[in-house]
């Protein structure tokens, strides 16, 4: 290998945050999503789209091993992060979840003060810096500081739904992850709150890699740089369906010039 090709290979590797290699995830004996090859680019927003039941949320949760908490859920294949297989026996799943944070569909603040919602995760992860500065910085990055700065001792549950979701984003940021996963983070929010979350995501990608699952195709167009479209097919002798990756490309290509007919049908609203 020449130095030029070696440098190019290293540069390519540095641009990939997460690499999913032939990933199949099953619940019991039934596969939920199969044979996925997918590389998530560093410093970009990647959207997973597709009809209900195609396995996109299951796949998202596999990136930080949240599926480990589901009895009977197994993964075959490899999920690489910084060149390390996250499912290797030597890997600590707690550390995985610190470095790859998660924001859920429903806002779920802790029953603690706004300040403690942000500080708690950092504290239990051994943060020894200035906690006040970390809390303020995290709330600012999540675009909720101005709404919270004068009531940091109030309960996080006293905030509006949109504010709670941005608080949850701040809580995730405070643990200093490298990747943030978002599972339909705006589905329970009103349009104004959704817009604020989307604006926040544009700022966050300057510091974090983001992967978002969304049923809202317009949202995928607005916020993402790259999009993966998943579909599902029936399985012989089974009542359910199994998801699979149809097409993965930059977002403009997926929505304006898709390579697969199924992608064209989905983004044009013919099914979903």
Swiss-Prot record:
Catalytic activity reads: phosphate(out) + ATP + H2O = ADP + 2 phosphate(in) + H(+)
Please list the GO terms describing molecular function: ATP binding; ATP hydrolysis activity; ATPase-coupled phosphate ion transmembrane transporter activity
- Keywords in alphabetical order: ATP-binding, Cell inner membrane, Cell membrane, Membrane, Nucleotide-binding, Phosphate transport, Translocase, Transport
PROSITE patterns named in the record = ABC_TRANSPORTER_1, ABC_TRANSPORTER_2, PSTB
Where is the protein found, in the record's own terms?
Cell inner membrane
Task: Name the Enzyme Commission number(s) assigned to this protein.
Answer: 7.3.2.1
Q: State its role.
A: Part of the ABC transporter complex PstSACB involved in phosphate import. Responsible for energy coupling to the transport system.
**Keyword presence, Cell membrane:** yes
Q: Where is the ABC transporter domain?
A: 18-257
Q: What is the source species?
A: Synechococcus sp. (strain CC9902)
Q: Which InterPro entries match?
A: AAA+_ATPase, ABC_transporter-like_ATP-bd, ABC_transporter-like_CS, P-loop_NTPase, PstB-like
Q: Where does ATP bind?
A: 50-57
Family in the record = Belongs to the ABC transporter superfamily. Phosphate importer (TC 3.A.1.7) family.
GO cellular component term, pick one: plasma membrane
Partners and quaternary state?
The complex is composed of two ATP-binding proteins (PstB), two transmembrane proteins (PstC and PstA) and a solute-binding protein (PstS).
State the protein's name. Answer: Phosphate import ATP-binding protein PstB
Respond yes or no to whether keyword Transcription is given for this record.
no
Topology relative to the lipid bilayer, per the entry, is: Peripheral membrane protein
Q: Name one GO biological process term.
A: phosphate ion transmembrane transport
């Amino acid at each position: 290998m020449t130095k030029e090709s070696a440098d190019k290979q290293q540069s390519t590797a540095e641009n990939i945050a997460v690499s999913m290699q032939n990933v199949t995830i099953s619940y019991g004996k039934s596969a939920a999503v199969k044979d996925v090859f997918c590389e998530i680019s560093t410093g970009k927003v990647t959207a997973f789209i597709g009809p209900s039941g195609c396995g996109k949320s299951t796949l998202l949760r596999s990136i930080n091993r949240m599926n480990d908490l589901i009895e009977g859920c197994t993964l075959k294949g490899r999920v690489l992060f910084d060149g390390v297989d996250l499912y290797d026996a030597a890997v600590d799943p707690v550390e995985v979840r610190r470095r790859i944070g998660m924001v859920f569909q429903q806002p779920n603040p802790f029953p603690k003060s706004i300040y403690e919602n942000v500080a708690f995760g950092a504290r239990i992860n051994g943060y020894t810096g200035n906690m006040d500065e970390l809390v303020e910085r995290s709330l600012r990055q999540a675009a909720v500081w101005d709404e919270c700065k004068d009531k940091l001792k109030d309960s996080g549950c006293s905030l509006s739904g949109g504010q709670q979701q941005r608080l949850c984003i701040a809580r995730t940021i405070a643990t200093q992850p490298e990747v943030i996963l978002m599972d339909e983070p705006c589905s329970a929010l009103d349009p104004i709150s959704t817009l604020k979350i989307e604006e926040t995501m544009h700022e966050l990608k300057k510091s974090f890699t983001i992967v978002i699952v969304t049923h809202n195709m317009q949202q995928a167009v607005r916020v993402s740089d790259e999009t993966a479209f998943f579909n599902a097919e029936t399985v012989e002798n089974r009542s359910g369906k199994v998801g699979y990756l149809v097409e993965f490309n930059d977002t403009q290509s997926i929505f304006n010039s898709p390579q697969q007919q199924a992608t064209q049908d989905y983004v044009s609203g013919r099914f979903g």
